Amino acid sequence: MNSIRVAVIVALSAIVSASAPDPTLPGIGSAMQDMIVKNEIAGAVTVVVSKDKVLHLETAGFADVVAKRPMSPDTLFWIASMTKPVTGAAILMLQDEGKLTVGDPVATHLPEFAALKTPSGKAANLTIAQILTHTSGLGEASGPAAAQAKTLADLVPIWLAAPMQYEPGERWKYTQSGINAGARIVEVVSGMTFDVFVQKRIFDPLGMTSTTFYPTDAQRARLATAYAKNKETGALEAVPPRPDFGPRDRPPQGNGGLYSTAADYARFCRMLLNGGTLDGRRYLSAAAMKFLTTPQTAPGLPTGFFQADTYGNRGANYGWGITTSILRTPHDGVAAMLSPGTYGHGGAWGTQAWIDPVKGVAYVLMVQRSNFANSDASEVRRAFQEAAARALEKR
């Protein structure tokens, strides 16, 4: 009888721990529940960290509604473009080692790019900085050939066959091919495939045990189902996972191929928040960090995803670092509670990480919703960030 009572107590304790992870900040959980009630999301995992610890980790709702599988701290998410800062960090690690600089012509490391021409017929002479700040004008890889690519090397001739979109440095346009070209440069310079490089140099030492381009069967079982909101009924409907699962026969795409958990990505954010170090290990130099944390685009060049007709001229309030979006000045809206100099990146399915060096905190939001009108300005992101800011002010 006693053993049964002990087992019941242990089981109940496990349920409580899973439903209300500690520590938590007040108000964030209820803000996410409001989003669930509104059918904006099925569930969420939220994390807030300081330089030295986790301030908040909380789950809400379901990872899979039909199966009634609740969100948990180890739920896996496709983080999409939140992969990009990892690619930027990899490039800057190689710069720290003297193996390249972001000012190098891309053709120095990928000779095929030497033949690339601009729309005016001039030699393109793209730099690594341009391809990683979305100012290169490089064309996108699309169509059957791109879909059948097995490696990043397979994508190079496809990028080069696509017409350039504009003269390098002339404007800012979000471009996936440039970030993947950066990942290919990591492969050529390091002698490792991109997935192996980031695993050995970033994920393993940081303890990011659930971050991968290629989830195992056990990890797939923890994957959150993605949902789209039916525009007519308002109901959330499941959509297929991306990128497609299967054997390791697809490139480790530096633009958006990673899966991760909220806690894992928060480790990466804490490393950046600490100026490139964590737990006594240095990953990036102070000089390298400046490329991630200060705009590398011109002050007057509009960047970002906020459209003038909807949000005012907010694009001018952002600059772009090496693979990071950087808030130049706060404004009303989704970023109102962030400090100048806050940087980070979101993902196509609503995930987001912001690192606020002024307040000394980082915010990580994990959801899986495929059809936000603008995931970077979504009501869900705003609700999370506002609730977190209010809670931090009261501490």
Can you say where each PLM-predicted feature lies in the sequence?
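Short, surface-exposed loop or secondary-structure junction motifs
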Residues: D64, K117-P340
